[in-house]
Swiss-Prot record:
Full protein name: Large ribosomal subunit protein bL36B
Example of a GO MF term: structural constituent of ribosome
Entry superkingdom: Bacteria
Organism of this sequence: Leifsonia xyli subsp. xyli (strain CTCB07)
Family label: Belongs to the bacterial ribosomal protein bL36 family.
Gene Ontology, cellular component aspect: ribonucleoprotein complex; ribosome
UniProt entry keywords in alphabetical sequence: Ribonucleoprotein, Ribosomal protein
Keyword Ribosomal protein in record: yes
UniProt xrefs under SUPFAM superfamilies: Ribosomal protein L36
InterPro entries listed in its UniProt record: Ribosomal_bL36, Ribosomal_bL36_sp, Ribosomal_L36_bact
GO biological process: translation
HAMAP family, A to Z: Ribosomal_bL36 (MF_00251)
Amino acid sequence: MKVRASIKSLKNQPGAQVVRRRGRVYVINKLNPRFEGLQG
């Protein structure tokens, strides 16, 4: 999981879900976990 300034490219990957937890925006990808990230 990487911290990214912009998660737009991560959320466009197949299998990506955008989730808000504790005020932070995460991208979770079960199909391809390489494309997981946190907006920060």
